[in-house]
Structure formats: structure tokens, C-alpha cells
Amino acid sequence: PNQAAAEMRARLEQRLGGKRAVAAMTIGTFHAICLKLLGDVRLISPGEALTIAEQVLRESGRKGGGKTLLQSVSRVKNGVSPEDTGLDAELYGAYQARLRDLGALDFDDLLTEGLKRDVTGLRCFRHVLVDEFQDINDIQYQLVRSWSRSGELFVIGDPDQSIYGFRGADCRCFQRLQEE
């Protein structure tokens, strides 16, 4: 498991009286929770994603590196507009088509697919706690709101400490939450 999630679990176990006290809790990163909610999915490795990106570039006759394409694809999937990333819609479509053909998801698809699945009312939590709230992006914000729709939401963060704007993080999430 993710180191931050493991540390959070350990702190909760210590404060609440052991492993049994937190056994029923869902603790993890957005990606880990979405993976758990999605169930049996084929998640490609970063190496496989790079191979696919390089194939897409080669087949399109475009120049550029697979890593650059993957970075742009990731930013778009995390809420940055394609115009801001310079990502060509044709390349994005070809990359996604290749994933569909393989019946697979990449790391960033976990959030978008998790949100699609959750919109059907699949999962709602009684209590949702989010640490480092200033670093979430729009997709993660939508997940938080969906997961907490029938429960309590508690967020921790500092809008002045947001460092992931390049990945789509939006510290205005605090204001947005307050307005809703």
C-alpha cells in the first residue's frame, strides 16, 4: 500500500485501539480506493503505458517521445484542459482506443472510471476524511463529493501550500466546497 495511507492507518490504529477498530474502514489514496471499488480490472504498468504511447506516436507518424505524450494524457485525465497541455485530440483518442482494445486501464483511468462507476450510486461513505485537500484536482473533488453525499465530510489542508497545480490541483476547492 501507499506509504501515506499506511501511516494514516497506523495512526488511526494507535488512536482508536488497534487493528480491529479500523478494519472496516476504507483508507487509501484516491487511486487505491477507486481500484478497490472497480474490482477486477486490468491495470497496465507504467512500462506498458510507455510502450503504447510510443506505438501511437510511431503509427501516427508524429515526432515526440512517449513520456511527453503520457504526461500530457495524464494532465488531461486529471482535469487540465487539452489546450493547456498541447495534447492533440487524435493522439489522445488513439491512446485511449489502444487501452480499450486491451481491455485495460492506465493509472489515471482509475479516477475517471471510479467516478463513472460511483455516479451510479455504488458507494457512499458515512464519514469521509481528506488530508492535503489543497492538492486535489477536479476529478478527485468530484469523487469526494460523491463519496460523502450521504455522510459527513472533513477536510484538512492549507490553500497556501498547494504545490500540484501542474497536475490539475486547484486550491479553490476550499471555496468551492464552502459555496456548495
Regions found by a protein language model. Give the residues of each.
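Generic structural signal for coil-to-beta-strand starts
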Residues: 152-154, 160
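P-loop NTPase Walker
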Residues: 1-43
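A short helix->loop->beta-strand "cap" motif at the edges of active sites that frequently abuts
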Residues: 22, 149-152
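N-terminal membrane-targeting/anchoring modules of bacterial envelope and secretion proteins
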Residues: 43, 50-57
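Conserved nucleotide-binding/hydrolysis micro-motifs of P-loop NTPases
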Residues: 2-5, 31-34, 159-163, 168-171
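Walker B catalytic acidic pair
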Residues: 132, 158
